[in-house]
Design a protein with these regions (language model features):
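Two-component/phosphorelay signaling modules centered on CheY-like receiver
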Residues: 29-47
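Non-catalytic signal-transmission and effector/linker regions of two-component phosphorelay proteins
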Residues: 1-23, 36, 124-143
Length: 143
């Protein structure tokens, strides 16, 4: 007897023709690994980083990313600084905050500092997927 697929998104992949790179910056190892695995399962090219310094290094040395998914509180700085630096460097990216800071004032600060979306921890994977698919549609229409 076949076992049912336990994945919350069986057989779902990004839109055809869209090859999006995602930088995941999260200091909590388990969270980073789960997000990285989920995004890769969905078919995205993922570059994980565990700190502000590591995230900035990846932005500088790796191929351009389409999406930054970052925690706000990092051991050596903030996701605000990461997105701010990406924007200063002229990077046109979709920036998604993933944080335990969920008060309306926290969401407002994230928006004012350059984030396009703010997701609370634990992450609503359905909502994250919808955001990424919207970006994929936009990328597909722009090409």
């Amino acid at each position: 007897m076949a076992r049912p697929n336990s994945s919350p998104f069986p057989n779902q992949m990004p839109f055809q023709g869209v090859n999006m790179r995602i930088l995941v910056v999260e200091d909590h190892q388990d969270t980073r690994e789960v997000l990285t695995g989920l995004l890769r399962r969905w078919g995205y090219d993922v570059s994980p980083a565990d700190s502000l310094k590591s995230g900035l290094n990846r932005l500088e040395t790796e191929p351009p990313v389409d999406v930054i998914l970052s925690d706000i509180a990092l051991p050596d700085g903030t996701g605000y600084a990461l997105v701010g630096e990406a924007r200063r460097r002229g990077k046109r990216v979709l920036a998604i905050a993933l944080s335990g800071y969920v008060y309306p004032s926290d969401v407002r600060v994230a928006t004012l500092t350059g984030f396009d979306h703010h997701l609370s921890k634990p992450c609503d994977c359905h909502y994250l997927r919808a955001i990424l698919e919207d970006r994929a549609k936009w990328e597909n229409a722009a090409s």
